[in-house]
């Protein structure tokens, strides 16, 4: 199972935006910890099972092959305040993080209507997962 935390494992256009995002957050006094970038299908299957067939809360709606992490186009982050992660989505820091990520050309899953994922940011290059599955490449 692979669940990378390295920005180097993202496709170049996503990596560039992710690096700019982390740097822009730092410039505004927000330290971000990258918790996930590339995730293989086995890791995605384990996450998808969580809250369904294994203990825990549901944390994703994406089955293996249907996550932008599987395509090296997404990252999950959390802010560190005094060295501790801020997971509560009620904390106003998440809105700041979301705005910074969007200003760097990333889509923020905190804006999604049906299943908000505050730590999740992605770069799609205007493509869909179906297009990637058919061989399209992110530019």
Q: Where do the protein language model's features map onto the residues?
A:
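Short loop/turn and capping residues at structural boundaries
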Residues: 36, 58, 111-113
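Short Pro/Gly-enriched beta-strand edge/turn motifs at strand-loop
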Residues: 55-61
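Soluble non-cytosolic domains of exported or imported proteins
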Residues: 4, 8-16, 38-41, 88-95
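Extended, low-complexity, intrinsically disordered C-terminal regulatory tails
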Residues: 22-55
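Glycine-rich, flexible loop/turn motifs
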Residues: 3, 34, 43, 64, ...
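Active-site acidic/histidine clusters and adjacent loop/turn architecture
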Residues: 1-33
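Charged/polar, solvent-exposed surface patches and flexible loops
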Residues: 12, 16, 23, 46-50, ...
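Catalytic cores and adjacent binding grooves of peptidoglycan-active enzymes
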Residues: 62-139
């Amino acid at each position: 199972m692979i669940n990378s935390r390295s920005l180097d494992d993202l496709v170049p256009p996503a990596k560039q935006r992710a690096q700019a995002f982390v740097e822009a957050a730092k410039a505004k006094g927000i330290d971000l910890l990258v918790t996930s970038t590339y995730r293989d299908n086995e890791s995605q299957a384990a996450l998808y099972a969580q809250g369904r067939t294994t203990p825990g809360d549901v944390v994703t709606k994406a089955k293996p092959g249907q996550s932008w992490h599987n395509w090296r186009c997404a990252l999950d982050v959390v802010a560190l305040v005094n060295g501790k992660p801020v997971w509560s989505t009620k904390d106003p820091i998440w809105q700041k993080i979301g705005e910074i990520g969007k200003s760097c050309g990333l889509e923020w899953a905190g804006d999604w209507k049906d299943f908000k994922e505050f730590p999740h940011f992605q770069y799609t290059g205007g493509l869909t997962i179906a297009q990637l599955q058919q061989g399209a490449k992110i530019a």
